[in-house]
Amino acid sequence: MQVLVDADACPVVVKEMLYRAAQRLEVCVTLVANKFLRTPPSRFIRALQVPAGFDAADDRIVELVIHGDLVITADIPLAAAALEKGAYVLDPRGSWFSRENIQERLTMRDVMEQLRSSGIDTGGPAPYAAQDGKAFAGQLDRFLARHVSP
């Protein structure tokens, strides 16, 4: 089992939690981004830089992910693709994507995109807050406790 991270928009606090988990549990964490990422020296942490381009990081994650992996992303289409390959998908705010909720989330994303393209200001996500980090940490810890042998 590996952890794949959609790192371009991933909050720093989430990356730091993942670095600590990688070291503590000796689980491979791979961060994928279209920019250079500085990561701590560790045989369990690697950064992959992909060429700049629409969905290049997402496409690389889909290539790498296998059944049973954990993907960290807020990108709904990427989450859908990872779920199709049998991965677990957690967003940086601590919410799980699942086969049961992905279609609803894709539909809502499409509706919001249509509203924005027609000129309606839909706002954006709320700023990342401490409670988001706590929710993510709790979900990550529970997942790793069930899926990684110490």
Swiss-Prot record:
Q: Which family does it belong to?
A: Belongs to the UPF0178 family.
Q: Which InterPro entries match?
A: UPF0178
Q: Which organism is it from?
A: Cupriavidus pinatubonensis (strain JMP 134 / LMG 1197)
Q: What is this protein called?
A: UPF0178 protein Reut_B5138
PANTHER family recorded = UPF0178 PROTEIN YAII (PTHR35146:SF1)
